[in-house]
Amino acid sequence: MNGAAGGDTQGKMTAPKDQDQWSQEDMLTLLQTMKTLLPGQDNSKFKTTESHLDWNKLAFKHYSGSMCRQKWMEISNEVRKFRTLTELILDADEHVRHPYKGKKLKKHPEFPKKPLTPYFRFFMEKRAKYAKLHPEMSNLDLTKILSKKYKELPEKKKMKYIQDFQREKQDFERNMAKFREEHPDLMQNPKKSDVPEKPKTPQQLWYNHERKVYLKLHADASTKDIKDALGKQWSQLPDKKRLKWIHKALEQRKQYEGVMREYMQKHPELNITEEGITRSTLTKAERQLKDKFDGRPTKPPPNSYSMYCAELMANMKDVPSTERMVLCSQRWKLLSQKEKDAYHKKCEQRKKDYEVELMRFLENLPEEEQQRVLAEEKMVGMKRKRTNTPASKMATEDAAKVKSRSGQADKKKAAEERAKLPETPKTAEEIWQQSVIGDYLARFKNDRAKALKVMEATWLNMEKKEKIMWIKKAAEDQKRYERELSDMRSTPAPTTAGKKVKFLGEPKKAPMNGYQKFSQELLSNGELNHLPLKERMVEIGSRWHRISPTQKDYYKKLAEDQQRLYRTQFDTWMKGLSTQDRAAYKEQNTNKRKSTTKIQAPSSKSKLVIQSKSDDDEDDEDDEDEEDDDDDDDEDKEDSSEDGDSSDSSSDEDSEEGEENEDEEDEEDDDEDNEEDDDDNESGSSSSSSSSADSSDSDSN
């Protein structure tokens, strides 16, 4: 206790008395733990050492670090912080008996003298000569001149000083070993803490290795010179060599985790958190480098403008960085809308490819690394509409495990209600903003806040005739919303009852085959949003027929990859469910299968009926003479045979499309599901009308 007498007043802090909460045993545990955290040579003022303590390491039981600090303040306020004469005499007695301890060890008459470094040898040799030549110079100026002269010395002359230093250094080491043998009482090392040494970063490991090599070549180098030289070397180190030290750092961290967990079992009072043990020793750049070599795909630009800028900047290395963005913005504005749309499509395609590549990358990673990658993907703000991607699936799954089970039923219900409602209609201003946001972002260098502010002002100052087009679009969107809402309300109850209620964290189903993946892609990118649902599905079918077998195989492979990942995620999710939730999930799925079978059984037939109806309509238009009943009968027979042939030839694709319909609930919004149900009803009515038409023909015949 080396503080001054005034330390008593300085050390006082207002802290609430909580003696009732702290038992004597707890207070003694706190003091004992504080002793273990004190430095080996505690020669500083108590206030200094106290300020350097890591109070979080003192936490134990239910006492946090701040509570431990508060309790220490209370206890220390009750203890005097000045020394009595008796204590000083005891210290003085110890000093007289053992005068050569601590930092004064080198004052022992027999302690070996350290050899001078090569530079100091040169300095001592030349100093007197230069002092006579330049008597007006100060010691500092002389030192600067001699330092410069030494650096300019030829290697041959410099080697003489280095060899002398190395010879004397060997003598010093021999004499030091002899001194240790003769004076073991003076060489007692302070007891080292048994806390495992923290793992080093890749740069620290590399520095320790290279430092030894550097000192062999530059024995006279100072610590600053070594740090500067090696720091420059590290910044220029090739990625492959840097990766070697990254792997070594990761291995060391794994070893540290194992040793530290054993240490925690022996010292439970330290209450070290799991985060403190598993904290990464890699920087963000080092982590990205390792991921890149492991095969992690590069994240694509977030939008078409960013993609355009990235492509343009690759050829603008000679242009100053301040001017690059200005040039990009100007050139983007000169592009036609068609060219901008092409970049938009290209950007969307890259995002899809990235998701597939990321899935493949995740499959080869251990679970711990998967969680890290998914957390990083979540942090950078993946779009909500892409929650069906594997990364967001698993991130949601992790979040579900962390959240409390209480109130889950209410959350599920609220989520279901939100999912049932169609997309809210947009205002005229919102539709206009969506169409011009790219240009404004380019103008303000991707500063969204500024762009939105200027867009609002532009809209307010816009003339009414310029707004008419957007007002009409908003009115159409409002009608769409009302139509979808009325369709949803008029949907029969059994169809809704058959729908699957989502469990929290449940992974979304992957496409079952190539056709489903193909249609999912077309529906999600918004390319067919201008078409009604029925025409949308017809267009998807016709496009599927037109693509080559190679492209179909590509979509089939994508679907298989997603299926494999889905099964892995689904198994993990099921294991995390409680017994009660698992039983409820299985029961619901059983009921869903039954209801789905009843509702969707005639789907393949209804397709044939729709086709036959369209053929009948064409026949009715061509056949203007309704009195010729025999010709009608012949045409009906031919139609039926054609229908049979077409059903045989497209049976495989129908089966794929049938599976697509089974998963429509997972792939589309509820309004689309309702419209599909309406399609089924229409197909049913069309089948009845066609059959009645056939019967009327036969009657007339």
Swiss-Prot record:
InterPro entries reported in the protein's UniProt record: HMG_box_5 (IPR029215), HMG_box_dom (IPR009071), HMG_box_dom_sf (IPR036910), UBF1 (IPR051762)
SMART domains: HMG
DNA-binding residues (ranges): 112-180, 196-264, 298-362, 422-489, 508-574
Protein localization: Nucleus
Biased composition (Basic and acidic residues): 408-426
Known partners and oligomeric status: XUBF consists of 2 polypeptides of 82 and 85 kDa, encoded by the same or closely related genes.
Name of the protein in question: Nucleolar transcription factor 1-B
